[in-house]
Structure formats: structure tokens, C-alpha cells
Amino acid sequence: MSKTIAINAGSSSLKWQLYQMPNEEVIAKGIVERIGLKDSIFTIKYGEGQKYEVIVDIDNHEVAVKMLLDQLIDLNILGSYDEITGVGHRVVAGGEEFKDSVVITDEVLEKIEALSELAPLHNPANAMGIKAFKHILPEIISVAVFDTSFHTTMPEHNYLYSVPREYYEKFAARKYGAHGTSHRYVSQRAAEMLGRPIEDLKIITCHLGNGASITAVDGGKSVDTSMGFTPLAGVTMGTRSGDVDASLLPYLMTKLGLTDVQDMVDILNKKSGLLGLTNGLSSDMRDIQSNLDKPEVQTAYNIFIDRIRKYIGSYVTVMNGVDAIVFTAGIGENAVGVRKDIIDGMTWFGCEIDDDKNNVHGEEAVISTDDSKIKLLLVPTDEELMIARDVERLK
């Protein structure tokens, strides 16, 4: 049996999971943090609750990869490098170019780097991870799995913005979405849990974490999603504003004395959302829920819930119906009250949540009542498994 490693490389981190394929068993997983900084943190979890952790300076991603592979051998998790038969890499932006996962060639890598303008915080880091593994394991197949690929099935009327069409034709200015690998996994898993072909289902998937997005999945294909040209659009998030009137930017820039539009975008990305609405209290939903006695925190919570309901309601219209609503990611999987508050405001189209079934954290469950016309599901996301599956598919 082959071993496949799924990689999520950040600018100063490397998150990974090692799978025994094709039986999809997680052999080990871990993260390298603070790459390029002093006191990098190197962690491997394996076996029956065993953990290896060391703090050491790690200069770059290639050093991190070499250290990871050597330590997997030292811990007898790998016998040699040769046991790894595939490496899958998360890549945030694939633009219109990549409609599916793809084997990474030099040409593909160049295109990934060229698409960095669509994801300047992510694609360059993803490319660093790819280069590091290809240098150390040059003969092993590498596969890029794009966050945006799942959304390339959106019809034109759902991905175009109402600006001059030439901006799309010249500059590819359009909605791309994000979290596609997560939405793909949980929609497929929901269909399996319901025992119905995904081709026959209309599903709304709610990926609710510090970043959050809602997707309409019709017959297994994404037909609309809340994130846009970048992951800044859509619902209210931990630190991101979600949808705002574009005219707000120049107005606030004038009031704040800003001259660089990127400074304003940074505020919308990093200082807004729940964090901004609570005057800097927190971007963490757990902190929000424990401070609902504060009026501004209650309002922030209400806005968070309201925006999600609005997107769900609009996607019922987009698909002319819905069979199931799925909750996933950190908030979606663990915040019992958030799920209840979202659904309690949407009983008008046949959603009924079962309070006992909903009292669950981080595990698969059908949480709707037996009489609910719309099935409600909790499905923990597993983007790493989807990456490993795509590597197997493309070998």
C-alpha cells in the first residue's frame, strides 16, 4: 500500500497529514510553525496518542520538509523516502485556469505563482511548499488541489460582477469563491449519510470558522458561493467584514486620512468582522458567546447569524429548493447555539432542529427532527483527505 502526504503550506507554517492509501488511514499528522523565525515549533502526532515536539530554528520550507521526512524515518513511521508515493498540496487560488486538481509540472507551478495576485497571502506560500517537496522528492508525483476548483461550475450569471464586462474579459475580475475543497467534501459526505445520490440533491453547505462561506451545491456541483473575487466577501467573519458597499472604502479612507487603498482593505480583512464589531474584544466565537451580556457583542452576534440566514435563504431561491443544510468547520462543528439560532430563524421553509441531536460537538450527526422537511447535518470537514484522494485519482 502507498503512503500519501497532504500539505497545507503557509508563509511561516507547514501543516501536513500522512495517509496509508487507499484505505485512507491517518498514520501521522503535524505542523511546523514559525518557519523563518526564531524558535520554530516542530510537532508530529502519531500512533496511540504519541507526540514528538521540538523547538528549533528552521530557516525555510525546504529545511522544514527535510526535517519532517527524516524525523518520520527516525520515529519508524516511514522506512524510507521511497514509501511516499504521492504529495498533495493545497493551493488557494486556481483562477479560471484550473477547474480540477492537477499533477504539478514546471508549467503548472509557474501558473500557480502567476495567480498570486488573486491570493497574495496564500499562493506564494503554497508554491514554496511545492518547491520544497519537489526538490527533496523529485521523482514523486505532486498534485495541486485548488480551493477555487469546486466553484468553477458556477454559471456565468452567478460569478460575474455588474461592472463593465471588459474588466472580466481583460482582467478576469469575477467571483472565484474559496473553501471549495471543504464544500466538496462535506456535500459528498452528506449525500452518503442520507443514502441518496448527490446528483439528486440540493445542498447548502455552511463552512463556519474564523473564515466563513456558504455554498449552494446542486447535483454535486457548486452553483453559487458567498466568497467573491477574494475571501473577503460574503458573510461576517472573525476579522473580515464580509459584504460592504464599495463606496464605504473611499469615504472611510478620507475620514481616516488613508492614501493607500490596500491599507483600507487590510482593515476590512484583519480588523473588521466580529473583532471590529465588538470594539476589539475578540474574533473568537467562544468569547463572543460568553460576553453576550454586552450590547455591542450581542449585536455582533446577531449580525453574524443574520448574514448567514440571508445567504441560506437566497440559495434556496438560487436552486429553487433545498434538501439539506450542512454545518462544518470550527464554529459549524462545535457551536451548538450558533446552529440552533441560525435554524430557529428559518422554520418558514420546513427547517426544524432537534435540540437533543444538536447537542454534539465535532462528530457526524443528523441534527434535524424526524419531521423536518429539510435535513440538517453536522459534518466535520476533512480537506486533507480530499487532497489525498485527489492524489490517488491522478496517479
Swiss-Prot record:
Subunit structure, interactors included: Homodimer.
Entry keyword Cytoplasm: yes
Gene Ontology terms: cellular component: cytoplasm
Pathway: Metabolic intermediate biosynthesis; acetyl-CoA biosynthesis; acetyl-CoA from acetate: step 1/2
Cofactor: Mg(2+); Mn(2+)
Record text on cofactor binding: Mg(2+). Can also accept Mn(2+).
Organism: Enterococcus faecalis (strain ATCC 700802 / V583)
Primary location: cytoplasm
Binding site for Mg(2+): 8, 383
Catalytic activity: acetate + ATP = acetyl phosphate + ADP
Function: Catalyzes the formation of acetyl phosphate from acetate and ATP. Can also catalyze the reverse reaction.
Lineage of the species this protein comes from: Bacteria, Bacillati, Bacillota, Bacilli, Lactobacillales
EC number annotated for this UniProt entry: 2.7.2.1
Swiss-Prot/TrEMBL keywords: ATP-binding, Cytoplasm, Kinase, Magnesium, Metal-binding, Nucleotide-binding, Transferase
Chain positions recorded as substrate binding sites: 90
Protein family per UniProt: Belongs to the acetokinase family.
Membrane keyword on record: no
Location in the cell: Cytoplasm
Gene: ackA
GO biological process: acetate metabolic process; acetyl-CoA biosynthetic process
UniProt protein name: Acetate kinase
